[in-house]
């Protein structure tokens, strides 16, 4: 469904150059749910802006369903739906009018628009509010309407740019129920950018992006196995964090530590060592508490980039 080859995007301004996307290669199959994970500034939004024909690449090639995004942008747009990170609804129109306008842009006939609007607004529990102005909607309701609108023309590819940012956990779960239902019904490909680990965890595959580079692509489980079987989390004094990091690097070769200013440090348990207790007994300073957990995608990002997601 998506073929990306040596994609680069460079922004130039006042004599300076910024490489937003740096020679990435990626293939995504039809019906696949792919998540692109990374912090702000990693290049995620630039990548989907090229994918959705909003931006042109500096170099490389991108195809959607066999169509080149530079050569055939209008045809590509017919095949994609996109939910932007920032709101894009017209709040002076009603929910139904927003759906109607979107359907007209995609050339749907009046009967098609009527059928699709009713089915999708019912799916996202907004049919009873269809005549209300969008300006009266809560943030969660607006997000649900944006999803319904993005599905109006039954796209082959749904692009989601941080679709649940700023929403409460309950609303986020509801949004994803709608997305997964639509994907199952229509065999749609989903391309998600997010920094919510639990959203990326439900994808078929995850790409880890940092500073414009795609540093890893695999299933969530395989990526987490690269970290190791377990992660140790320690609570200590904040001024003891650096000595512990230095000790771990010097004697165990551990450089992939996650540290916060409150005195918490986490790191993968070295394979072949005598266990967590044996390591902790050798560490400098006072250890106030210890827990052991399975690796998550944040640990993957730290190992791949040497940095925290935040």
Question: What do the PLM-derived regions correspond to, one by one?
Answer:
Residues 1-4, 9-23, 30, 73:
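A short, flexible loop at the N-terminus of ABC-type nucleotide-binding domains that lies
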Residues 100, 104, 111-129:
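Conserved ABC ATPase "signature" region
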Residues 154:
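Conserved catalytic motifs of ABC-family nucleotide-binding domains
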Residues 158-161:
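Catalytic Walker B motif of ABC-type/P-loop ATPase nucleotide-binding domains
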Residues 173-186:
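Helical segment within the ABC ATPase nucleotide-binding domain
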Residues 232-304:
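Short, charged/small-residue-rich alpha-helical element at the C-terminal edge
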């Amino acid at each position: 469904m998506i073929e990306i080859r040596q994609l680069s995007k460079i922004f130039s301004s006042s004599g300076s150059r910024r490489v937003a996307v740096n020679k990435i290669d990626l293939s995504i199959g039809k019906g696949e749910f792919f998540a692109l994970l990374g912090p702000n500034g990693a290049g995620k939004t630039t990548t989907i802006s090229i994918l959705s024909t909003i931006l042109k690449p500096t170099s490389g090639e991108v195809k959607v369903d066999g169509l080149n995004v530079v050569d055939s942008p209008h045809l590509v747009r017919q095949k994609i739906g996109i939910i932007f990170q920032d709101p894009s609804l017209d709040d002076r129109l009603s929910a139904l009018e927003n759906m109607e306008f979107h359907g007209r842009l995609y050339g749907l006939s009046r009967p098609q628009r009527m059928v699709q609007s009713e089915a999708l607004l019912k799916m996202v529990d907004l049919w009873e509010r269809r005549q209300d102005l969008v300006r009266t909607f809560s943030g969660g309701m607006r997000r649900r309407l944006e999803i319904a609108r993005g599905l109006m023309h039954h796209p082959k590819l749904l692009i989601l740019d941080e679709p649940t940012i700023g929403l409460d956990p309950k609303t986020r779960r509801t949004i994803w129920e709608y997305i997964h239902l639509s994907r199952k019904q229509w065999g749609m490909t989903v391309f998600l950018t997010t920094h919510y680990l639990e959203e990326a965890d439900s994808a078929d595959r995850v790409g880890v992006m940092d500073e414009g580079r795609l540093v890893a692509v695999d299933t969530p489980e395989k990526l987490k196995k690269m970290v190791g079987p377990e992660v140790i989390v320690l609570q200590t004094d904040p001024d003891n964090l650096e000595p512990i990091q230095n000790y771990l690097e010097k004697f165990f070769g551990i450089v992939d530590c996650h540290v916060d200013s409150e005195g918490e440090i986490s790191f993968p348990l070295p394979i072949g060592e005598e266990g967590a207790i044996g390591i902790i007994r050798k560490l400098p300073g006072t250890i106030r508490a210890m827990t052991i957990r399975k690796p998550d995608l944040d640990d993957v990002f730290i190992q791949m980039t040497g940095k925290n997601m935040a």
